[in-house]
Amino acid sequence: MPPTTRRRILAVAGLTAVTGALGACGLGRDPFASEDSEDSGAGPIVVGSQQYYSNEIIAEIYAQVLETAGYTVTREYQIGQREIYLPQIESGDISVIPEYGGNLLQYYAKDPEATDAGSVREELFTVLPRDLTILGSAEATDQDSYTVTRATADAYGLTSIADLAELGGTVTIAANSELATRPYGPSGLMSVYGVDAMIDPVEDTGGPLTVNALTDGTVNVANIPPSSPAITDNDLVVLEDPKNLILPENVTPLVRKSLPVGATQAIDAVAA
């Protein structure tokens, strides 16, 4: 990884603080996980990340704790969305990547039954490909959201996603184009909340371009992580999701089962 990228990650992350946040009150590992993998020097551990800044920060935390534990690490960051990186970890090109429980479950289970963080984990163990497993989930989440401006919320009395129907017509949402096919995208908005919506693609994963599209009135709604400083900086309103359209997205390491036990223990020490 280029030195400038490494410095940017460490500066933005406040690495020690982020590690502590990830480690707080973990949700636990699979009690039936196999412990028979053997530590070996058979090639580097490949740590991947999504094309999303906070995911890259978490991936770098994993990479550094693995190196501290004595493993050789190859970094493959900014890979893209699940349609790209999940086939790579399934094939063995990637060893570990930070994931988000609810989104990962909805990728593999088209009609999941889970509604909370614990049941998301339980169901994941039943649907993941045979060579993959998850380690301990953190209490920390990185949720998707449906967010509006304060002016829009006040004008239409919006507090919940269901209230978007008050806008009338087709609601426009600034978000990555992938949201158009996600279960909690337009199809989910219609089936769960009766809201007619369409995606206005902005490919920066809730970043400045997405925020600008919302604040300048280009769109009605934006998918911005609730943890983003842009929420408070722009006095935005994250709409409530009483029907759990968006499942809990606790940060969860997705790993190959062949990962050495020592490596999984090192990741678990900061992940959960």
Predicted segment positions?
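Ligand-binding "clamshell"
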Residues: 108-135, 218, 230-243
